[in-house]
Amino acid sequence: MNLFLAGLDHTTAPVEIREQLAFSQTDLPSALLQLTQADNGSPPLFTEAVILSTCNRVEIYGVANPGTTAQHVVDFLANFHRRPAGSFVHTLYFYQGEAVARHLCATAAGLRSLVLGEAQIQGQVRSAYEAAQRIGSVGSVLHRLFQIALVAGKRVRHETTIGKGAASVSQAGVELARRRLGDLRGREVLLIGGGEVSELAAQNLIANGADRLTIVNRTSSRAAALAERYGAEMLDFGALPEALARADIVISSTAAPVPIIYRHHIAEALSHKQRMRACGDCDPPAMLLIDLAVPRDIAADVAELPGVYLFTVDDLREVVSHTIELRSAVIDIANQIVEEQVREFSDWLRTQEALPVLTMLRQRAEEVRNEELTRALRRLHDLSPEQRAVIEGLSRSIVNKLLHPPTRCLREAAAHGQGKRYATMLAELFNLEHALEHKAGAMGNTELTDRMR
């Protein structure tokens, strides 16, 4: 089974590259269909696919067809996002087989997050799986993989203290503001966005003393709901220039595909602040901008303006780096749980080696049973319906009893890594060459990533 992963994350690629390869919710259907549907007679790259795209990672999980190479996936990313492969290929990582399961389980557990142990990633993994399921690109392998990964995440959070005191990206952003500005009381804080990140930011701002919040979002109903919950002022998106002119701190986290704040927006806000000051000789006004979105909400050249301090998600490392040292013992326990879940998936995957041969064996047995039963019933034409049912039941029982030992033996052999050997023997004994060829195709292509390198 060609289980495959190609991706990049905050450890391999800066936000400038991650935002170029990010998949929006509107992108996902077409991207998943391109990965799993034939194109001009050519087979698709994958029989199953899930795309996990968050502010810190872009990953494609799939069951690859024979002939699919890592270069094919690089080409897909380049073509879909209209970016030259040379601009990002050096940031990609590739995994196969059990390593894919290990990576996803650790990811769902928060072990590969910028903010160690953060809980949001588990919901993001689930959302990615459900989105692919709605498109129809999830089959039995990725279904099993993602369910086991979600269990890994849940177990790590329940069986360790990794989530105790763990920050979120939002909390880290607020902590960054507190470190830069000190007391947040009396500061004008503008939150842009109406999703989970903004809500968590509002919670943490209030917990850190902020008492003057304004929320702006394209969907005014979501902004109004957040404002009501946290005692904030709500403004329509069209009032963003006005909100910027009042703000000391801006925390932005929308899902916009391009920036919503450009240099001229902040320049105008600073000019307005300066005009409103009674003191002509005062220092120029300052603004702290924290961009938690990927793709970024705030244009990078905004940071060139005097008095402006712009931070992205990649700048949060200084706030959260200490958590790795503080939780090293907990990480060891979490990794043990991850390994247990990986073994469970690997055991299940090995049993799948037996399925093509077992399916063909039962189909062949059923063909023989039907042929012989039809021949016998033609000769016993005086039987009543009840007698015919008895004979048919007898034939089924004989077949099931005969097939039970080899079926059990092959499943057990597969669970212990001997499935290929036993399946080959069984296929030869029962003349099931077609099943053997099918299995070989499903198990082949071991050079999937080697060809890339």
UniProtKB/Swiss-Prot annotation:
Please write the reaction equations for the catalytic activity of this protein: (S)-4-amino-5-oxopentanoate + tRNA(Glu) + NADP(+) = L-glutamyl-tRNA(Glu) + NADPH + H(+)
* Keyword set includes Oxidoreductase: yes
Q: Which pathway, per its entry?
A: Porphyrin-containing compound metabolism; protoporphyrin-IX biosynthesis; 5-aminolevulinate from L-glutamyl-tRNA(Glu): step 1/2; Porphyrin-containing compound metabolism; chlorophyll biosynthesis
Q: Which molecular-function annotations from GO does this UniProt entry contain?
A: glutamyl-tRNA reductase activity; NADP binding
Annotated site, Important for activity, chain positions: H103
Q: Which residues are catalytic?
A: C55 (nucleophile)
- What's noted about domains in the record? Possesses an unusual extended V-shaped dimeric structure with each monomer consisting of three distinct domains arranged along a curved 'spinal' alpha-helix. The N-terminal catalytic domain specifically recognizes the glutamate moiety of the substrate. The second domain is the NADPH-binding domain, and the third C-terminal domain is responsible for dimerization.
Q: What else is known?
A: During catalysis, the active site Cys acts as a nucleophile attacking the alpha-carbonyl group of tRNA-bound glutamate with the formation of a thioester intermediate between enzyme and glutamate, and the concomitant release of tRNA(Glu). The thioester intermediate is finally reduced by direct hydride transfer from NADPH, to form the product GSA.
* Protein name (record): Glutamyl-tRNA reductase
Q: Which organism is it from?
A: Chloroflexus aggregans (strain MD-66 / DSM 9485)
